[in-house]
Structures are given as structure tokens and as C-alpha cells.
Amino acid sequence: MGDFQSRYEILAAIMGPPNTASFKEEEHSGSQTKNYPVVVKCIQEHDPVDTTNVLVADDLDSNFEPFSITDDYGKYENTLVSHSSTILNEPYNESPSSSSSDSSSRSTSPFSQLSSQSLRLNAEEIAPSSLINKAVQSTLRLSEPLVSPIKCPLSEQFINFINQQDSDKVVLIRGFLLPHLASLTTKNVSEPELDKLRHSLYNWWVSILRRLQSNISTSERITYTKAILAIAKHHCWNKVEHSALLYLEHQLILYDTLTFVVHLLSQKSLPYSLTTFCASILVLSFFQLPLFADHFLSALDVKKKYIDALGSSFDEKIMIISHKYLAPFFTDQFSSTMHPYYPKRTSTPFTIGYNRQPIEFTRAWMRRFKSSTGGFFFEFLSCYHSFLALQFSFELPDNVIYFAPGYICLHAYLLELTISVIHISDKKPLMLPTGHEQFPCKTLPEVNPSMEEYNPKMPVTATTLSTLQQFVGHIKDAFKKIGDCRQEQMRLLAVLEQVLINVAKNTPAFNLQSCFLLCSLVEQCFGVFNDFSHRFDFSFWISVAKRLISTSHNMSIVRSITFIYAVWPYLDIKSKELVTLQWLLEENTFQELFLHWSPLVRAYFQRLVCWRFLKLDDMEEFQFKGTVTLRVKNLLKHYFTAQALYHEECLVNGRASPITKPSEPVPMRRLTIVCNHYQNYGNSESTEFELSNYKQDDGTIQALVTDVVSISNSFSSGLKKAFGSLFKNVSGLPAETEIAYHHTLSASNSYVFTDLVDNPDSMLKSTLKYRFVFKFSPSQPLSSLGKNKEKYDALLERSSHGVLPVQSKMLLYNSNHISCPLSSIKGVSVNGKRLVYTSRALVEWALVVNEFDHALSLRKGNETEDMEAPTLTVRIPKSYASNIYN
């Protein structure tokens, strides 16, 4: 019985060195070959080994027809049994398989038939027949018996696995192999015992891989892939390189499995049951096959600017000590893939030698990494992080993990994919140097770019939103799959935050579609941060919102407002103070938005102030909200004083008095509040639907109409298509139920907020089950609804003391806020050009406050803290977008 060294020498004599001359001839033969998984035609026990007897299966079509097995498979099983029966009585002696002999019989290219017969290798020319038979017999046994008399269950069950039928094989794997591997440990196991265990698992691996390549059902395929992953990921393979023969066996079978995976990825469609299997094998090959990481990262072709952008986010001092901490986990072959690493383009295919067919990184299978919606890259990334979580200890210094093999390069590729999702063009960057807080004047060339830079393809279509939602869905799935390791989740969360920051830095400020999608992406990712308890730095995103507002483009300003509105629940007190007291409620900024010339901007900003800044969500924010309330009250009183002075000036100079009638947010349109079911759409803060143009149905009764926001109870084809049976009105009741009550409402109440029904308490819910969404929908012009100047004047008169929501008034009862320095204002004079909008803005604000109070009145008792704020979203109407650019 030969020892391990003799077995290795015999195998090497049969296979030749890693790069044989005959293999090099094959590379230059010029024949067109295709990559296929290997199916070895096995031989009888005493037949000489012919390394040319290799079967190649046909291509897999879209229906995934696996490789066929020849009749010699039965001979292979009988051979295994005959060899295994002679060693069953040896204590803990691993059962034989054709795996070792397979290694010798696969010395030729196992994945394609050579076009030239002269290139085929003959085993007799490499080694004599007696030496080959000796190698086969040697690889079927292990040299040293164990001291323990206990038999190895893996060896015994492997013989049963060979002799059983196909269905029984699956039962054996489910009932024995998978549970046994889950409980199998290598603690206090000697090296000889560990080597025999590895060889036994190698036999299982080879046999299961052959079964996986055959024509099997989906359930069997899932079982076989789980078994291979359980074997390949088992910790017994750690430091297998110390044993030359076992390391060779492990490299060969892993390479064969990788070749099978590459063939699967090259098919037109990949079964979902094989996605995790393929990604896991690629990750194992990335870390365990020499030079595969270099070829793989080179094939991804990540741009250098993205690697630099992401790599610069981490401290370079950590790179100096990173090799010291990472050396115990990785061999020297990975030193070239650690940061800083820029993949070098290479045209040579990847191979481990031993006459294995090289793997070419063609578009046929690398295309799965290029798709941002396919999800395979995210599956690979989650498996990558899972592997690191198992390998690294928790005592590593901060940021050392970022210098692991391929870490920066892979996440730079994530940055590149993210940028491609929102269709970034190489134009002006979004961010300006720090300190750019003032609104630019109209003469700056960057404020008034050419018409080409505006990109008039305005509406964000359902396709782009669907792509974005799929992208974020893959990100969420990646975090869930590494849920067993909280530290690895935190590392990926930190990298994702840096990815989003770099995406914003590469976003053109005047490409509205990119800006819209960027805001939607960040809003959803902030929800991911909140779900996984990641604290992010919001100061950068405040500068992003400032940059959008500084463009002076109406829709960019509206999108920045809705962005703040959507992410508000995820902010801490410090971030909320930065948004309110140090930015939006600062005198100049508040005047710019509250008295903006566009009624659409005013409508959105006023709802941001009312529903977010003044609404009390948590009693812990009582002090902060009191300061904000006083600041808003003082600003409103200041604007009313300015309006009164301007009104007197107009009377003295004989000019027309300022108009008090509110303006429509969008010409010939109104904002409509509709409801989407809370359970159906989850916690999304930006659920959006595109409502097409349609005419109001005849007989529809207008329930409640205001000049800034209108609450529509009409059923239309567009609303039915978007919401179906879940369509509700503002009270959360079916529209038909309330329309009956609305017949009793007089036309005189159309412009004031009154109870929708005579007895609203009878139909109220104790908890809010729907969240509201502001939407555009067509309506008749407000001018046709009648004149109610007296009511507008009454609303304006109330502004003399500052109109505040009822809920906010309780904050003023706390005397500690009276002398709060942050609540005072400097009394900045109102710009003369904006005085004309003061009266309208104050009336519109009063209507917004009434709208808020009316929603609170629909709540039972005083349960206002848990009340959901409306989801404020924006979609640019097509007609409005076309009018902007024409």
C-alpha cells in the first residue's frame, strides 16, 4: 500500500506537470472549442487507463437539458464496489471511488473533443500500464490505518450510494450526508484522520457532480447542489495545501465544478435553483483556485476612476497594516488583488494545467454580472461576504476588511452598476465645493444651461422605476443572506453608503431624470439602512439637496423637497436640526421657498413644513419641535407684517391690491390625495403610480375642493387601474359610501374645510391603515368654481398671529421656548419681487394647516403621535413637461 508521496508521484507521472507541452500545442491548434462539463467514461478494474476516453455532452438549451451518462457508468459503479469491498474491514478506511482514477483519466481536455487526433494523449506513452494500475489501486486506499477501530460512516454510506437507484441516492443524501456534514467536526482530529476524511469527501464530490450533470429532476438537482456546497464549504478543506496529493485532488474537482458552473452560466436561461450554487462555486474558486481572482477581476473590467473613488474613502494608513492582519487568512497569491489593485487586461484563458480545458471569460457567461436587474452579481456579492464572515475573526481593526482580495474592486463594480441604473451622462457633477449655500443669480451660465443639457425626456417611466425597485430589491436580499453575521452586514452597509455618495458626485445636476432616480434610490436605501440599524451621515445629502435647489429649476426644487419629506422618519435629532434650524427655516432659505413664484414649489414646501417639521411624532422631540414651532410662527408673523405694509403701499400709489386667491399648483391640474393600502405596499415612502390623462366621469360629486389641494372621491379608469379595489378617499372609506353623504354638502362649503359627514365618529378607524399620496390628476380650472374673496381675506387675517396646526399650539404652552435663541429671527426684509406672492402664500398656508387639522379630526381621541404622515411624491405631468421646454 503506497503512501501519499508515492501516490502523488504516480499521479504526476500520469498527468504530467501543470503546463505540458502537448497542452500548449492544443492552445495553438486553431480549432474552435467549446467549454463543457466533464463526464468521464470509466473503465473496468483491470483495464488500462486511456485518458482519451472522455465523453462530451451536447449544449444545454434554454430548457436546461443536462449532460448524458453512458452505459459505462454501471461499470464504474461495479468497479467501485469491487474495490471498496476489499477494504471495508479496515478501521476508518475511506471508501474508494473512481474520483482518483478520474483525475488521471481526465488528463486530456474533458470539455471538448480535439479536432486533431495527433493532439490526443496516450496514457501508455506517459506511463506504463503497470504503473497506471498501481496508481489506481493506490488512490483507492489510504496508507495509514487509524488507531480507532470505529468504521467511517462516510465510506460505508458511499458504497450504498453507488449501488442504489437514482431516487434512493437522493434519499440517502437528504437523510444521511447533509445531516452528517452539518454535525461533522474536525476538532481534535489528527492529520492522518483528516486526510482520510478529505479523500472520502472528495469521492462523494466527484460522484455527486457526475449525477448533477445527468438528466435529473429539479428536486434532485436542488439536493445535489446542496450536497456539493456542503462538501465544498466544509472546514476540513482548510489548509489542505499541506498535503500535496489531497490539494491536487481538491484543485482538480473544484476546477471541474467551476467548469460546469461556467457552462450553466453560458446558457440562455439559468434555473433559479442553480443561482446560489453557481455564485457559491465562483466565490470558492475566487479564493481557492490560484490566479482565478486575477482573471475574474480583469474580466469585470472595472473603470479605474470608480476604484479610485471608492478606495479614497478609506484611510491609506490602514493599507500599511492590512497585510499584517490578512496574511494568516490568505496566501501570497492574493497579494496582487489587494488594494490598491487595478485589474490588468489579459487575453490568456484561465487554467490550472494538468490538461484541463482552459476557462475563457467570454461574454456568454460574464453577461450575467453586467445586468443590474438580473441579480446574479448581488448573489455573488452576498456569497463573497458570507465567505469573509466565516474566514475573518471579529478582532480585526477597523477598515482592514476593505483591503481583502478584490474587496475594493468588487464594490467599485457595484458603484458602476448603480450609476448605470440611473442612466448617468458625463456632464456637470452634482456637488459643488463646500460652502455653496446661497442661491445663484440668474446670470451664472451653470444656472441657465443650454436646452440640450435639460434633457426634455422628463417623465420617469414605469420601466425605469421598475428597474430601480428591482435593483434595490437585490440589495435587500444581499443583506438578508448575510444576516447570520452582523459585523459583515455593518461592513457592507458602510460600503453601500460610500457607493451612494459617489453616485451623487457623478450625477449631472441638470439631468432631471437622473436626479429623480438618484433621490428615489437614496430614499429606498435609507429604508434599508433603517431596517438594519445603520447610522448614516446626512450632512452630505443636505448638500445634495442644496445643490438641486440651487439650480433654480422648479422640478428639481420639488424633488429635493420630497426627498427631505421621504427620509425625515429616518433622521436623528441632530440631522433634523441641520435640516430645519440651520437650513430650510433659516430666513433667506425659507423666504426663497415659502414665497417662491411657482405655486407648485410653495405647495410642496408648505406640506413639508406642516407634516414633517411641525407634526409631533415622538415626545422625545418635544423640545426640538417647540423651537421649530416658534421659528415658523415668527417667520409667518414677519411675512404678514410685510404683506400689510405692501398692501398699504399699493393703496397709496394707486396700484391694484395684492391677490389673495390661492394659485393652482399646476395649470389646469390639481393635487389629488389618494390612498394605497398599507399592507400591500409596505413601508415604502415613495410609492409612485403614473396616472394617465382622463376625463372625470359624469355625475361625480366633488367632495372637498381647495385651491391648493383637492380631495377627489371620483372613480376613474386611471385610479382603478392603479389602485383597483384598494382605492380609498381621505377618510379611508370606500368612495361610494362617502359620495352619498356628499350630496348633502352645499356648494358654499366647497372652499372651506368642514366635516365630510354629519357624524364622522361613526365611520372612523381606531388605527390608520392607509397612507396618503399626493398625485396629479386633471380637473376643471378653479376660476370656474366661483368667487370667495371674503373667505380668502378671512384666512389671510388669521395670519396676523401666525397660523399653526392645532397639534403644534400645545408646544407653545411650554414657557421654556419663549426665550429660545434658535427660535428668533433677524427680521430680514422681504425681497420686493416676492411681496406680490406674500398674500397668496399665507392663504395657501392657512389651507394646508386646515388640511392637517382636518386629518387629525378624523382620529379617535388624541392618538396623534402614531398618525402616519401622507406620502409626498412627485411626478411630472407630460403636458406640463412639454410646456416647460417649448
Curated annotation (Swiss-Prot):
Belongs to the UPF0592 family. One of its GO terms (molecular function) is MAP-kinase scaffold activity. It is a multi-pass membrane protein. The keyword Membrane applies. Pfam families: DUF1765. The chain crosses the membrane at residues 277-297, 374-394, 400-420. InterPro entries: UPF0592. This is UPF0592 membrane protein C7D4.03c. It is found in: Membrane. The keyword Glycoprotein does not apply. One of its GO terms (cellular component) is membrane. It comes from Schizosaccharomyces pombe (strain 972 / ATCC 24843). It comes from the Eukaryota. Residues 95-112 have a biased composition (Low complexity). Residues 87-112 are annotated as: Disordered. Keywords: Membrane, Transmembrane, Transmembrane helix.
